[in-house]
Amino acid sequence: MTPQAALQRVIEHREIFHDEMVSLMRQIMSGEVTPVMIAAIITGLRVKKETIGEIAAAASVMRELATPVKVPYDRHFVDIVGTGGDAAHTFNISSTAAFVVAAAGGKVAKHGGRSVSSSSGAADVLEALGANIMLSPEQVAACIDETGFGFMFAPNHHTAMKHVAPVRREMGVRTIFNILGPLTNPAGAPNTLMGVFHPDLVGILVRVMQRLGAERVLVVHGKDCLDEISLGAATMVGELNNGEIREYEIHPEDYGLQMQSLRNLRVGSAAESREMLLGVLGNQPGPAREIVCLNAGAALYVANVADSIGDGIVRAREAIASGAARAKLDQFINATKKFA
């Protein structure tokens, strides 16, 4: 499909079918499409509203072109990731939860980048903690093997995005590329806890992950507009398990947690996020620890470590209280420094 034909299709609010979208994405990612046409097409898709099929096709091309991290299959492998864009400016909840999960029996292949709309992206806080994030795919694999935790800095694995990045920067609005990152884990983690910035994306992205062959997935959206499981409101959930999809809501009270404002979880920089992360892993009581336990518990459930989210929360608390989660952070940082 030519870019001009694709643009005409989206202007008419008609779907671009799978093979056409695959062809179009390959052209975009190889630099064959001009910046003007890229901007027009992705704007048209946004206005039309991207379909499950269009997103799945685009993600399949991103996966095909990504530089992979080759690790043995493990049913406890999980990615904990968010689309960002929720404008909540909370500390790095998913990054903190990832260390808890790795300490409690999961294996984490975390995929992320620098801040776009938040105060601190995953890459920013890990660097603030002293980790070396500029690892080769082989070094990331070695880190996962040694520590049970690895971080894949997105620009190192999606080099074809260089043709799109300047367009996205200049446009400054959400497009299909905001939701492709969480769908394209270079290590191929079979399980995912994915936070999304809009309620409509819960049902859409859990079905995209189903089409992409994921095993277990929780797509979540806090109804206070958080792209995590929230302490401040009910959370919408789309669950994929054994090929079946369920959609439901969960509440903090379901797990004996008190609903509370996110105000005390906000940060203004990676340094502030670092301090909050260290406080949680140091077992400092408060809402930050509670929201991390809630999200880590869900990740342990989706990673086949816990039998339920509630069981996962118990395991998360134990990993923090015992010092295992903080030890996992230190182990990871030391492992990455060996490659500096």
UniProtKB/Swiss-Prot annotation:
Its cofactor is Mg(2+). Its EC number is 2.4.2.18. GO terms for molecular function: anthranilate phosphoribosyltransferase activity; magnesium ion binding. Anthranilate 2 binds at R168. It is an enzyme of class 2 (transferase). InterPro entries: Anthranilate_Pribosyl_Tfrase, Glycosyl_Trfase_fam3, Glycosyl_Trfase_fam3_N_dom, Glycosyl_Trfase_fam3_N_dom_sf, Nuc_phospho_transferase. 5-phospho-alpha-D-ribose 1-diphosphate binds at residues 82, 85-86, 90, 92-95, 110-118, 122. Keywords: Amino-acid biosynthesis, Aromatic amino acid biosynthesis, Glycosyltransferase, Magnesium, Metal-binding, Transferase, Tryptophan biosynthesis. Mg(2+) 1 binds at S94, E228. It catalyses: N-(5-phospho-beta-D-ribosyl)anthranilate + diphosphate = 5-phospho-alpha-D-ribose 1-diphosphate + anthranilate. Belongs to the anthranilate phosphoribosyltransferase family. This is Anthranilate phosphoribosyltransferase.
